[in-house]
UniProtKB/Swiss-Prot annotation:
Protein name: 2,3,4,5-tetrahydropyridine-2,6-dicarboxylate N-acetyltransferase
Pathway: Amino-acid biosynthesis; L-lysine biosynthesis via DAP pathway; LL-2,6-diaminopimelate from (S)-tetrahydrodipicolinate (acetylase route): step 1/3
InterPro entries found in the cross-reference section: DapH, DapH_N, Hexapep, Trans_hexapeptide_repeat, Trimer_LpxA-like_sf
Family: Belongs to the transferase hexapeptide repeat family. DapH subfamily.
Name of the encoding gene: dapH
Molecular function terms from GO: tetrahydrodipicolinate N-acetyltransferase activity
PANTHER family recorded: 2,3,4,5-TETRAHYDROPYRIDINE-2,6-DICARBOXYLATE N-ACETYLTRANSFERASE, ACETYLTRANSFERASE
Pfam families, per the entry: DapH_N, Hexapep, Hexapep_2
Amino acid sequence: MKMMDANEIIQFISNSQKTTPVKVYIKGDLEGIDFGANTKSFINGQTGVLFGEWSEIDAALKANEAKIKDVVVENDRRNSAIPLLDLKNIKARIEPGAIIRDQVEIGDNAVIMMGASINIGSVIGEGTMIDMNVVLGGRATVGKNCHIGAGSVLAGVIEPPSAKPVVVEDDVVIGANCVILEGVTVGKGAVVAAGAVVTEDVPPNTVVAGTPARVIKEIDEKTKGKTEIKQELRRLNEDN
């Protein structure tokens, strides 16, 4: 797994074409109207659907106002610098409502649950579950076979670019509603108890809890049983 450099991300955002994509339902005398060179139009008689950049479509709507009877515009962003990740060919289970930006790496058989927000430059390892409403900030890196509990936040670091990102190593379990601050590394096999605020590195194979989080014990068989990762939840159809 590779981690994007902060300056690479900054340049990506700076140089990107800022877009305001829209979907427009339109009704009227539509024959012969030029909705713009980059607009995709699906016109059938006096009704149609347009997909394109708002500035281009808006200009066409204003220029042909007399011909248009009704318009409904769907729009969910303005001057957006980073598109959403194309999910179609990712070998992972990604549930509805997850927001995943471009330049995110997702390993095979990972699970991304509803409401998760994953920012540019994040890396998610094979077989890792990102539970509901988790936030992975820019450049946050999670290893293989981890579980990041519902509502947890892994702080992002894009600005300032010198800041060290959160790194969660393999086989880590993070409970619900935890906060892992920038620069923290959570060591392999560690467990972070629900609600913890982690401000310092977590040693491998330890359990931490509290605010700020402190080591409360080493991993034992009882803890392993309570925090077992279930591979059945990560299984995909064979043809996927």
